[in-house]
Curated annotation (Swiss-Prot):
One GO BP annotation of this record: translation
Function: Component of the large ribosomal subunit. The ribosome is a large ribonucleoprotein complex responsible for the synthesis of proteins in the cell.
CC per GO annotation: cytosolic large ribosomal subunit
Record CDD domains: Ribosomal_L29_HIP
Subunit composition and interactions: Component of the large ribosomal subunit.
Subcellular location: Cytoplasm
Name listed for the protein in its UniProt record: Large ribosomal subunit protein uL29
Keyword Cytoplasm: yes
Intrachain S-S bonds: none
HAMAP family xref list: Ribosomal_uL29 (MF_00374)
Sequence similarity: Belongs to the universal ribosomal protein uL29 family.
Gene3D superfamilies assigned to the protein according to its UniProt record, in alphabetical order: 1.10.287.310, 6.10.250.3450
GO terms for MF: mRNA binding; structural constituent of ribosome
Length: 123
């Protein structure tokens, strides 16, 4: 089998991808048997190509699954941890804009009574 391109895989359905994955795994096992029995050099170099193709198929499968999950959870209140944005622990625990802007009654009164003084400088 020739090298598989990821862009060709993206248009396929999951069943087709799984079938292709199974074919690639069978081919890899045959190549490994040929390696043990002393196969041709062309078969030995093909092992690497098949392994990388398997990785591409698996990558496309996981990416499409994750994309579908993102669509499903869009607009919902809670999302799975792996779909949430990966930030530092401190950033995840930080107050949001609304919570930061909240003021106590005492602070509101203080701001009202003692507003910031503006001075004009005479040139």
């Amino acid at each position: 089998m020739a090298k598989i391109k990821a862009r060709d895989l993206r248009g396929k359905k999951k069943e087709e991808l799984l079938k292709q994955l199974d074919d690639l795994k069978n081919e890899l096992s045959q190549l490994r048997v040929a390696k043990v029995t002393g196969g041709a050099a062309s078969k030995l170099s093909k092992i690497r190509v098949v392994r990388k193709s398997i990785a591409r198929v698996l990558t496309v499968i996981t990416q499409t699954q994750k994309e579908n999950l993102r669509k499903f959870y869009k607009g919902k209140k809670y999302k799975p941890l792996d779909l949430r944005p990966k930030k530092t622990r401190a950033l995840r625990r930080r107050l949001n804009k609304h919570e930061e802007s909240l003021r106590t009654k005492k602070q509101q009164r203080k701001d009202l009574l003692y507003s910031i003084r503006k001075f004009a400088v005479k040139a």
